[in-house]
UniProtKB/Swiss-Prot annotation:
UniProt-recorded name of the protein: Large ribosomal subunit protein uL22
Upper taxonomic lineage: Bacteria, Pseudomonadati, Pseudomonadota, Alphaproteobacteria, Rhodobacterales
Biological role stated in the UniProt entry: This protein binds specifically to 23S rRNA; its binding is stimulated by other ribosomal proteins, e.g. L4, L17, and L20. It is important during the early stages of 50S assembly. It makes multiple contacts with different domains of the 23S rRNA in the assembled 50S subunit and ribosome.
GO MF term set: rRNA binding; structural constituent of ribosome
GO cellular component, one term: cytosolic large ribosomal subunit
Gene: rplV
Length: 126
């Protein structure tokens, strides 16, 4: 009479990975997330590897984690995986300051983001 098992948050042919506290703004992170959205995972890995954006290496780590979760935890075939969703959200904003002229103080906002990547196994028709 133990506690009931939590239902899966994703479908049977899906897996996801989530990264929190990425030190970039959500607007900049969404540019890289849009780069891989809807692509096959091998093409997405190639795009992220050669991207010039600084945050693309962190997005690549999250994508590789989602692929590993799909393979090891859910038994999905890696060759048939597609990035079904890649979205980001706002996390905390560190507020810092800088002394300015005439005794004033300028606000500097240092935003953090979070990223969720969901991969889905599709058939040969993808």
């Amino acid at each position: 009479m133990g506690k009931e098992k939590n239902p899966r948050r994703v479908g049977e042919n899906e897996a996801f990975a989530k990264v929190k506290m990425l030190r970039t703004s959500p607007q900049k992170l969404n540019l890289v997330a849009a780069l891989i959205r809807g692509k096959k995972v091998d093409k997405a890995i190639a795009d992220l590897t050669f991207s010039k954006k600084r945050i693309s290496q962190d997005v690549l780590k999250c994508l590789q984690s989602a692929i590993a979760n799909a393979e090891n935890n859910h038994g999905l075939d890696v060759d048939e995986l597609v990035v079904s969703e890649a979205f980001c959200g706002k996390n905390l904003v560190m507020k810092r300051g800088r002394p300015r002229a005439r005794g004033r103080f300028g606000k500097i906002m240092k935003p953090f983001s979070e990223l969720t990547i969901k991969v889905k196994q599709v058939g040969e028709t993808a």
